[in-house]
Regions:
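N-terminal Rossmann-like FAD-binding beta1-loop-alpha1 element of flavoenzymes
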Residues: 63-86
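Conserved FAD-binding subdomain of flavin-dependent enzymes
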Residues: 106-136
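Mobile amphipathic helical/loop "lid" adjacent to a hydrophobic cofactor/ligand pocket
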Residues: 34, 133-244
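Conserved flavin/dinucleotide-binding core of flavoenzymes
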Residues: 27-53, 57, 152, 373-377, ...
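N-terminal export signals
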Residues: 5-26
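Active-site/ligand-binding neighborhood in enzyme catalytic cores
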Residues: 192-299, 305-307
Length: 513
């Protein structure tokens, strides 16, 4: 590609449409009109703003209705094989944040990226769907300006372009968070499971850490700006929060476990392979068990407490299903507007939930640009890292003339959330990303054919200070015959456990006493 042509197309939203744009080094592009498709939010925004929908009487009966078709909902549905149920998903695709896209035979990760190679989740996937992950392997790399520091942790930070004093501060940081996370982990698991305290002193330490931001914790422990900078790059996509907005406890717990990817696996396109297998499995259990394009706007227990009425919008028509039990598998901040029966204290807790918008910018090249590391973190860019999309199939291979897609984590700061609605701003972020990659790999922009941003915002829970004490006790607190799955927090493995537990709770409500 000639430099004057820059990028032929930027594909954004969930529609595959081409945007002609000017070269990175040119003037700002003219406003661009597109027919992009956003995540379905308008009906929920209407609820938030006080709009009163006219609720129709029930015209359909099911034993169970599941709100959403993300990982938790799909696990719940799969574990209710003999139950007459339906999953109502507002998007046209299932899988929640675990989705992928395909370009010229290469899958791109659009959300959830990897998981442990050995776990009960993987045992389940192998047993039920003959689905096993491929090893990722290797270590994190880190780009500072134009210097690529490979094997950051394995080489004990020796490659950093800093003084020995600063390198020693990185080592102190890793030693401290590793020690703290190891000490707190057992009690944290008990806390996350909703069980009674085993070690009161450790529980107190957890709550104290949870009450302050990670930025504050870094400052109190006198870490230099170079360590803070690393955390500001690493935390948004990995912890789903910037340090200034995040619970110190959550950041320490997650960062304390980062070392290498030698026991971590994935599939081409990330964990979407598991979500797709689950959706197919649920569909095979019975016709009509997943209904996409169905935005739930009201979930209410009947006055006699024997049923739940679930009202949803599909094709601009409101419909109500009556069921014996409903599993809430959607975002909890939506639940407070949709479930009028929600107790005031639970509603108040859910009002404190914040989300971080994370998307993937996929840079599509007609040759291989970089294939030495799975995740390479970088500074001075809208994105936080880049990953070869087909790494698990071709990791480390030398193949210069082979087309390559670099999938980039893009966590958008909360203060810039409104900018996600601006086409020209999205294009600008894509251009800045391509320009930064070209600084690191000179001439790479000449081989860039296309940039894809499938969804502008996957909403991930921002574990803000106080989340563990003020919010978490309520996320799985059921409301009558409405089972709250607690789907908002945790990994794909956590989604499995939450889905199975929700299925059991719904089954209990099907028993006629």
């Amino acid at each position: 590609m000639k430099r004057r042509d820059f990028i032929r197309t930027v594909i954004a939203g969930s529609a595959a449409l081409g945007w002609p744009v000017q070269r990175t080094y040119s003037e700002e592009p003219e406003p661009i009109q597109t027919n992009r498709q956003h995540v379905v939010r308008e009906p929920l925004h209407m609820l938030r703003d006080g709009y009163q929908f006219s609720i129709p009487e029930p015209t359909e009966f099911r034993e169970v209705v599941i709100v959403g078709a993300g990982a938790t909902s799909l696990f719940a549905a799969y574990h209710l094989p003999g139950v007459d149920l339906v999953c109502l998903e507002k998007e046209l695709r299932t899988g929640g944040n675990a989705q992928r896209d395909l370009r010229d035979g290469t899958y791109m990760n659009l959300g959830a990226a990897y998981t442990d190679m050995e776990s009960e989740l993987i045992d389940f996937m192998e047993r039920e769907f003959n689905l096993s992950p491929l090893l990722i392997g290797g270590y994190d790399a880190y780009v500072l300006d134009k210097t690529i520091v490979r094997n950051l942790y394995r080489d004990d930070f020796k490659g950093l372009p800093y003084s020995e004093r600063i390198k020693e501060e990185f080592r102190r940081f890793v030693a401290l968070i590793t020690e703290i996370s190891a000490r707190l982990r057992d009690e944290a698991d008990i806390l996350f499971a909703g069980k009674a305290t085993v070690d009161p002193l450790v529980r107190r330490e957890i709550l104290d850490l949870d009450s302050i931001s990670f930025e504050h914790w870094l400052r109190v422990n006198n870490f230099p700006k170079e360590v803070v900078k690393w955390c500001e790059i690493y935390c948004p996509p990995q912890v789903s929060s910037f340090p200034k907005n995040s619970s110190a406890f959550i950041c320490v717990l997650i960062m304390g476990g980062m070392q290498n990817y030698d026991s971590i696996g994935s599939w081409p396109g990330g964990l979407a392979a598991m979500a797709e297998a689950l959706a197919e499995g649920v569909t095979k259990q019975g016709q009509g068990r997943i209904r996409t394009g169905s935005c739930v706007i009201r979930v209410k227990n009947t006055i006699d407490g024997k049923f739940v009425d679930v009202t949803y919008l599909q094709d601009n028509k409101l419909q109500t299903i009556r069921c014996r039990a409903c599993i809430w598998g959607a975002h909890n901040h939506v639940a407070r507007y949709v479930i009028p029966d929600m107790p005031a204290e639970q509603n108040d807790a859910f009002s404190k939930i914040e989300y971080l918008d994370i998307s993937m910018i996929n840079l599509c090249f007609n040759r291989t640009i970089y294939n030495k590391d799975y995740i390479t973190w970088l500074d001075n860019a809208p994105i936080q890292n880049f990953m070869p999309a087909d790494w698990v199939l071709n990791r480390g291979k030398t193949r210069e003339d082979t087309p390559q897609i670099l999938s980039c984590d893009w966590a958008n700061p909360p203060e810039k959330r409104s900018m996600l609605l601006s086409d020209s701003w999205i294009v600008e972020q894509c251009q800045l990303t391509a320009s930064r990659i070209n600084e690191i790999f000179p001439g790479s922009i000449d081989y860039l054919e296309e940039i894809r941003v499938f969804l502008r915002a996957h909403s991930w829970v921002n574990y803000s200070p106080g989340y563990v004490s003020d919010v978490m006790p309520y996320v799985s607190k059921d409301i009558g015959r409405i089972v709250m799955s607690g789907t908002d927090h945790g990994s794909f493995s956590d989604s499995m456990y939450a889905g199975i537990e929700s299925a059991a709770a719904a089954s209990d409500r099907l028993v006629v006493h």
